[in-house]
Amino acid sequence: MTQMTDAKSGITTEEMKFVAKEEGMDVETFKNLIAKGYVVIPKNVNRNTKPVGIGDNLRTKVNVNLGTSPDFIDIACELKKVEISNKYGADAIMDLSTGGNLPEIRKEIIKNTNLPIGTVPIYEVGADAKAKYGRVIDMDEDLIFNVIERQAKEGVDFMTLHCGITKQTVSALNNDPRKMGVVSRGGAFLTAYIMYHDKENPLYKEFDYLLELLKEHDVTLSLGDGMRPGCLQDNTDRAQIQELITLGELVDKCREKGVQVMVEGPGHVPYNNIEANMKIQKTLCKNAPFYVLGPIVTDLAPGYDHITAAIGGTLAAVSGANFLCYVTPAEHVRLMKEDDVKEGLIASKIAAQAADVAKGHSIAWKLEKEMADARMKHDWEKQFEIALDSDKPGKMREEIPSKDEKACSVCGDYCALLMVEELGKR
């Protein structure tokens, strides 16, 4: 049984009750969204995961990517990133490790959080194929599905799988060449496999078998966008849309089988094209939850891509995206460090909150009203408690204090709020 099959059968699970309460929603209404596939709860049956809802009519959620690379392998560092994710309000974590003992790293990450954990299994497949055969492109079907099954048994809650990379998608790419080609690692692995062997993508060819594996453990399928644009010039081209059409067809199959599914979206999109991209996805994929990387709205800001992504992410979430994958200042430059994780997470949470306010979500507005009340009362402790980052503003206030404990050092004696407040007392 999965959350979706239960919902279709009229069964209300404890996870549904928990998430509905968190979202301030009637549980029957929420259950109906699960049954239709408009909302997912990524929660493997083999793991005691905190239930988190992702999808329409819910608060916008934020994911943190972390993990090793062949150039930097330090489990302690990754666990510190997990700690930061837990502390500053991530809704999910993806382990994208590609260096070191991948099962051991994943095991430690899972052990140190109760947040939903996602992976991209093709990374481990590629590492295993390289170790066994010497080349990533020599991976085979057995290796692919063995890794997926093993990770499902370990408790992974959702998996990015690039099932929409097909011979037809690769043909669309070849017929409409891009500036930057394929920038998705998983997408590149499978594109290279198709081109070298002249074989169909096993994840697409054996999709029914894949669904059986995922359904057994109630792993949520996150349909990866292997043809996402890697620069603004490549946005919304034929390869991207061809893959999205295929993903829409696969969403239908997932729902028929009772497998929870969400769809991943583009990374580099001009601001004026973001709304159209969200509407295309929601239409082709029949309102499946949409999970976007950014989108990044300019390619000119390496070192500041947490900002470019927050700008794009806000509009994306207002226009239909449900799940924002954070982007850190290290994007396009190097592996993220601990401080990068915090900055990227806070930036994405700002985007999510701004979007939820724009959509009129009651919980988002409740927080905004509480902050306004705290500011009006000069209650600095309450302000910092409500803030998305409770640590930074307190430290900043201590750096340049005001003589008046109610005011801040920008205005001091000339504080507008205090001035009008004093006049009101006379």
From Swiss-Prot:
Pathway(s) of this molecule: Cofactor biosynthesis; thiamine diphosphate biosynthesis
Ligand binding (Zn(2+)): H268, H332
Note whether RNA-binding occurs among the keywords.
no
Biological process per Gene Ontology, one example term: thiamine biosynthetic process
GO MF term set:
4 iron, 4 sulfur cluster binding; carbon-carbon lyase activity; zinc ion binding
Q: What name is this protein filed under?
A: Phosphomethylpyrimidine synthase
The organism of origin for this protein? Methanococcus maripaludis (strain C5 / ATCC BAA-1333)
| Cofactor(s) required for function per UniProt | [4Fe-4S] cluster
Keyword Lyase attached:
yes
Q: Give the highest taxon in the source lineage.
A: Archaea
Q: Tell me the enzyme class.
A: lyase
Catalysed reaction(s) here are:
5-amino-1-(5-phospho-beta-D-ribosyl)imidazole + S-adenosyl-L-methionine = 4-amino-2-methyl-5-(phosphooxymethyl)pyrimidine + CO + 5'-deoxyadenosine + formate + L-methionine + 3 H(+)
